[in-house]
Amino acid sequence: MSSDAEMAVFGEAAPYLRKSEKERIEAQNKPFDAKSSVFVVDAKESFVKATVQSREGGKVTAKTEGGTTVTVKDDQVYPMNPPKYDKIEDMAMMTHLHEPAVLYNLKERYAAWMIYTYSGLFCVTVNPYKWLPVYNAEVVAAYRGKKRQEAPPHIFSISDNAYQFMLTDRENQSILITGESGAGKTVNTKRVIQYFATIAVTGEKKKEEATSGKMQGTLEDQIISANPLLEAFGNAKTVRNDNSSRFGKFIRIHFGTTGKLASADIETYLLEKSRVTFQLKAERSYHIFYQIMSNKKPDLIEMLLITTNPYDYAFVSQGEITVPSIDDQEELMATDSAIDILGFTSDERVSIYKLTGAVMHYGNMKFKQKQREEQAEPDGTEVADKAAYLQNLNSADLLKALCYPRVKVGNEYVTKGQTVQQVYNSVGALAKAVYEKMFLWMVTRINQQLDTKQPRQYFIGVLDIAGFEIFDFNSLEQLCINFTNEKLQQFFNHHMFVLEQEEYKKEGIEWEFIDFGMDLAACIELIEKPMGIFSILEEECMFPKATDTSFKNKLYEQHLGKSNNFQKPKPAKGKVEAHFSLVHYAGTVDYNIAGWLDKNKDPLNETVVGLYQKSSMKTLAYLFSGAAAAAEAESGGGGGKKGAKKKGSSFQTVSALFRENLNKLMTNLRSTHPHFVRCIIPNETKTPGAMEHELVLHQLRCNGVLEGIRICRKGFPSRILYADFKQRYKVLNASAIPEGQFIDSKKASEKLLGSIDIDHTQYKFGHTKVFFKAGLLGLLEEMRDDKLAQLITRTQAMCRGYLARVEYQKMVERRESIFCIQYNVRAFMNVKHWPWMKLYFKIKPLLKSAETEKEMANMKEEFEKAKENLAKAEAKRKELEEKMVALMQEKNDLQLQVQSEADSLADAEERCDQLIKTKIQLEAKIKEVTERAEDEEEINAELTAKKRKLEDECSELKKDIDDLELTLAKVEKEKHATENKVKNLTEEMAGLDETIAKLTKEKKALQEAHQQTLDDLQAEEDKVNTLTKAKIKLEQQVDDLEGSLEQEKKIRMDLERAKRKLEGDLKLAQESTMDVENDKQQLDEKLKKKEFEMSNLQSKIEDEQALGMQLQKKIKELQARIEELEEEIEAERASRAKAEKQRSDLSRELEEISERLEEAGGATSAQIEMNKKREAEFQKMRRDLEEATLQHEATAATLRKKHADSVAELGEQIDNLQRVKQKLEKEKSEMKMEIDDLASNMEVISKSKGNLEKMCRTLEDQVSELKTKEEEQQRLINELTAQRGRLQTESGEYSRQLDEKDSLVSQLSRGKQAFTQQIEELKRQLEEEIKAKSALAHALQSSRHDCDLLREQYEEEQEAKAELQRAMSKANSEVAQWRTKYETDAIQRTEELEEAKKKLAQRLQDAEEHVEAVNAKCASLEKTKQRLQNEVEDLMIDVERTNAACAALDKKQRNFDKILAEWKQKYEETHAELEASQKESRSLSTELFKIKNAYEESLDHLETLKRENKNLQQEISDLTEQIAEGGKRIHELEKIKKQIEQEKSELQAALEEAEASLEHEEGKILRIQLELNQVKSEIDRKIAEKDEEIDQLKRNHIRVVESMQSTLDAEIRSRNDAIRLKKKMEGDLNEMEIQLNHSNRMAAEALRNYRNTQGILKDTQLHLDDALRGQEDLKEQLAMVERRANLLQAEIEELRATLEQTERSRKIAEQELLDASERVQLLHTQNTSLINTKKKLETDISQIQGEMEDIVQEARNAEEKAKKAITDAAMMAEELKKEQDTSAHLERMKKNLEQTVKDLQHRLDEAEQLALKGGKKQIQKLEARVRELEGEVENEQKRNVEAIKGLRKHERRVKELTYQTEEDRKNVLRLQDLVDKLQSKVKAYKRQAEEAEEQSNVNLAKFRKIQHELEEAEERADIAESQVNKLRVKSREVHTKIISEE
């Protein structure tokens, strides 16, 4: 997410693209409850926000935002996303992906005027219905070069991504913009074109000038100006949109190799030409009509002979005539200027306006019916005169052609009469055809003008097409549009799946192959496949008597009940009738087929078309000529259903042309990288900011946004990098990732997710990311929020405690300081009046003044000497530095020179090798191109030879026709027709010669452009396209020739020509397969060469690795030597510390001497002499100390010299290594060797870097030690400045020098940081090189895979070719047979041969289709070969890039060596400065000896305080250890206690539930009432017999299941412990009451256990495995708990060792002790409360008796409920698991209770002692009470024994019932399996029957068709036979006449 500073570049558009950081943070911090915040289904709003109040039985009660409470089902509730996802820019990242989340995200962003939002691959845009400042030049500049995730969503971001992908990936791009009318498709298309026109010319100082007289503007202006012209003629007002595009368009913008604009072209689809003659009330026709009548240009009004009132013209005034939001006058000027900019001539401009005016006049033409006839005649000629004048036609001819058109019947033309309605229909069709053809011609002219003939490399296509349409009345237009969207959605699904598949494959995720593109295949095949809707429609158009009803019947017969996507619509009141329904992906659409046959045929008045072709207006004549039709087919203009016309004699329907253009569009899209934009209408009223939920949801479904989300949810939509996941979610379980050791982010993420309680099937681990299913990330976020809340609360508590303790510590220190001051003041007040003290006060200053003067003089002399020495040392150091710098510079220059020479030599060799390779490749390509050109020339020669043969055959046909001319009169007419068609053929052959000439020109162009490989590939693609077009034309011409020969009924020539055509196609296919085979062999040879080179590279890599190992050994030796030097330095440092210690001892002795002097006061002369001796000794010791320091300095100097020598040796060795590296670089031949060498060098550098870092750390430690010493010395000097004023300036100089040292240290640290950054940069580059290498290897592997695919395809082609040859030979044999039959009996069998000819023609057509399929496969193989060549070129470019990167790395390595030398130089400088500072410190340390008086008292006091502090610290540490152990134990006890209490509560709840359910079950068992009546009287015997029964059960369970042993043993032990405790406590009343309470509680527990065991014993065998697994799980959990406890123990030990303040920990422990004592008191109170429970004994007994009575009452009703016991027994199996868990809890409770019992035993002993003192009376009373209680216990035991006996009987009964239920269940399962098998068989039989019925229907249809054809053939044969008989009679009569005359 960008910051506010980064968003500033967007200017005023920033708030409309992304909200500020403050607003985002406020929105995300809103209160949110993930469990209660939901969306619920609402009847009005579709979905509303709500808060869950309760969930019961699959129903959810929620309170909506409006305050209403609703109850809905679970599946109507959708969870809400956390606030962090509010207004999210990419909806695919939401953790909960569903319809309401998408809807409300769009709504909230739209309310904030952020109209663009991503949804995975989609960019969704909502129409704002107002102007927003988000398209200005500032925004264009801000989006340029930005990645998608770096900027807010925008159409400019999509455009720039397409542009950048085109430049980087060298692949054509496309932007698919879809949506309903009024959604903003056209506006976004304009913005895309504006963006490309802006950025593609940025940087050009001079714009392109006009290259001819036609161009009136630059290419950018023309591209932008194409929109106003197309909008004027193609846009209109609709109900939803004032400027709705009524056609689809695909704009291709071509770019050159550098990314500059080269040219553009436009393809149009589905123009709504019906709007020319008809509009709804709320709509109007195309804008151009109203622009012309706006009277902005009066000369147009005069020229077109029209008025300014639209109501004068019927075609344009059926709806509204004005639009408030459009100024027609301004739009007219924009259209007129666009015509100028686009280079239309003045004649063309006038023609455009005149034809538009003629269309308006057509609507006013009137016709009437003749009297007593149905014939129409003109009702006035004024309007017709105007229309004819505007079109340069004769008015009378026009009217005659309309009323009396000439129709061709056979080979004759007849005049046909027209009714009035037929004339009006013809006029409307002509008006629509003129307008449509003019529009398509304008598109063709625009394309010609935008084609600048500049070299173009790639293109970006922008598709602006209508979205899915579901209206009340849906016709053929809606079917075409919906079918287009279906194909586009399939294309998107497949593309999205491929991207997801690549992502999963790249990340190594196991993913099942699901091609979502196949989801829509059923609907698409239903429409376009053979016998589909389009196929049936075209078939019906072939029959003259076909109607809409017959078309509907055929649809029903073919598809109703056989395809799930084809349905019969349900009749709806108030709606137009629908004939069939199709289930599209966006919904079910009802279609009305009225008029589909006429729409598909698209008939025109051929007589009027002939007039148009002869018009003197060139534009009109061109529109209706054959060239225009060809231009339509090439430009794609007509785009489908509107512009189809007949070409030659072929018959092409609107649907066929639409499918052809759609297939071209899909081919274009598949060859590009697509980008998807979906436009949304927010409301129907065009209100800004308002959003209608149902409308938006409908569009999201239709646009495929929700479909994309469905696909996304199938996989893993949420994905996070491992490092980000570890950083964000580590807080969930920090203990899962061990501290203090390195662990990979991926392993850490795996451990973290494995330790969290989530569904582990909902995520997968990739190579770099972790993938999550939808919804899991939201759960993790919720868990993280809860954890953070706990941590923050705990942190706040710790911080508050810490602050309180700090404040308390300050108070304690303040108190101690006050006590110290008070003590000293009192002592001073006591001694200040002593006489000796007064004398001391007077003498003490005098002694100090004399001493200070001497010391000052000595210090001055020493300072001067030190200054001189420092100056000399500085001078020497500077000289040495200058010399060293000069030497290092020379050394670096030499290294750089040698390195540059080696690099230049290596680069030259590599360039030479590369040029040789490219030359060889180019020569091979040129050779291939020339060979292909020669092959094409041979093919063309063969075609010309065939043409000659055809001409010869035509001459033979002429002779045959001359012979037949004597007998048949009609044959003469057919002959003339044949001659005309032959002339047409010769003209087409001339066109073929022109195409051959074009091919030769292209060959020359290819030979000239061989040096540029990319241009060569482009030319080859153009050549292939032209060849395929020529081939299509040739095939069409051959088809025309076949038609003419069919009319002449010459079957033999048809068959021979078809044979030759098949032979030619086969030869072409063979040659293409040979070319593919040659290419494959070349690729195999290249692969073998590459593999050989890779093996050589591998061997060289191994050699260099061995050399790298040797270098690493040398470096390790050098590192060992450096470590030895460091050890010597450490020894020197230790000796220096020893000397310092001696100095301190001497100073301490001096201080003791001075103390004695001060105590003596006025000493004798002997003492003074003694003091002088001591001073002399002190001076001698000082001199000795100085000599020792000098010796240490000398040794340090020698060590430094050794270190410098070792550094020099290292430098020499580095130079040697450099020379060796250069030699190795010369031997490098491929990129992989350089990368490996760099890797080895990087390892060496990293190790040397580590050594240098160690040295730097040691130096930093020394600097820090010196710094601390300097600071201490500076502090002492500052204290003496008050007494030494003259030395103040000198101390200032010292402090300044210390600041300089600090700055030097900071400089060193900064240098170190820069050094580390450079090394990290080198590592990053090395990783990039490794990634590039892996990418190359992957590309090589993919190319091998492609070669394998090509080989397989070639084998398939060979098999197909063999099949074709067999078919051809069979056809040839049949042709020979038919030829012999024809020659023997040609006249009699004419009709039969016609039938055979049709069959053969059908078979030939099938063979041709097969050959076309083979050619298509060959073309696909050629494309794959070209793609492989492109990939090879890409690999070569990648190799060049990696070579350049290696050179850059070499340069960086040299820079690194230079930086290393500078670092060493800085190190020596700092070392010298450190030595100087050490000298200064030694000089300052001599002064410390003179500062005795002020230092003595503080030193003594400090020593005493230290000793005391040390003792205290030792005591405190001992106490803290003890306290910590005690606290830990108390803490553990507290945790155990809490856990036990929690388990106790859970156990009690579970036991209560189990008791209630089991009591309910007891009432249902048969015959239990007899046994339970004795429970009251025999409860004493029940306890004893229960003991025996438990023992028996224990033995049984040991044999049956070992897992139940633990529970039974626990119960037996608890009971035995209770009995033992009861016997021990017989002597005391309190003890007996406690035991009685315990025994009663145990009796109740025994009763409950008896009921529990009743359920346990029922399904023991079934749950044996579950119990074992549960035991193993418990063991694993115990082991995990022990491990965690060990980890916690280790952490506690570490924390204890790292405590910084012992006082704080001691107080914490004291506080914890207090807390523990309070908890102990709480435990005592709980124990007392347990003792008080004895008073409730009598009440408990009465409650038990009442319960027994209830049980007896329930037993009386048991017979009625006994039948339900079988079903309820299954429920008890589920409770077994619960009881197993409770048994474990009971075990833990028992141990705790044993501890409490021991405590109580201790207290009872004390009470017993008290009781003995109480007296005999009290004892007697107690004994009596005990006996009473014992009697009661015995009675209870007896009753218990009786209950256990009854229990055994019931258990046997329960076992019998369980066995019976098990048998019944097995029988039911067997019956269910049998039923399922029978149902599956029935379904299979039904499916087979349906298939057989379908096949029979197909066969029946074929049979009927063949029977119909047979009947027609028989009729024709009868007619022919009768004619033959007549001719025979005539010939005989003629013969007889001749004989008679003779």
Swiss-Prot record:
Q: Which residue ranges does the record assign to the Myosin N-terminal SH3-like domain?
A: 33-82
Residue ranges of domain IQ in the record = 788-817
Every Myosin motor domain range: 86-785
Task: Tell me the null mutant phenotype.
Answer: Knockout mice exhibit impaired hearing and outer hair cell dysfunction. Reduced prestin (SLC26A5) activity in outer hair cells is a major pathological feature in knockout animals.
Q: Which residues carry this modification: Phosphotyrosine?
A: 389, 424, 1467, 1495
Question: Mind telling me which GO cellular component terms the entry cites?
Answer: A band; cytoplasmic ribonucleoprotein granule; intercalated disc; muscle myosin complex; myosin filament
Modification type Pros-methylhistidine: residues: 760
Annotated region Actin-binding: the residues are 662-684, 764-778
Q: Where is this region: Disordered?
A: 1156-1175
On tissue specificity, the annotation reads: Expressed in the cochlea (at protein level). Strongly expressed in spiral ganglion neurons with axonal sprouts and supporting cells around hair cells. In the organ of Corti, it is expressed in inner and outer hair cells, and in supporting cells.
Taxonomically, the superkingdom here is Eukaryota
Subcellular location per UniProt equals: Cytoplasm, Myofibril
* Keywords assigned by UniProt, alphabetized: Actin-binding, ATP-binding, Calmodulin-binding, Coiled coil, Cytoplasm, Hearing, Methylation, Motor protein, Muscle protein, Myosin, Nucleotide-binding, Phosphoprotein, Thick filament
Q: Name one GO biological process term.
A: muscle contraction
UniProt feature coiled coil, ranges = 846-1942
Molecular function per GO: actin filament binding; ATP binding; calmodulin binding; cytoskeletal motor activity
Sum up the protein's function in the record's words: Required for normal hearing. It plays a role in cochlear amplification of auditory stimuli, likely through the positive regulation of prestin (SLC26A5) activity and outer hair cell (OHC) electromotility.
Q: What is the protein named?
A: Myosin-1
Organism lineage string: Eukaryota, Metazoa, Chordata, Craniata, Vertebrata
The gene coding this protein? Myh1
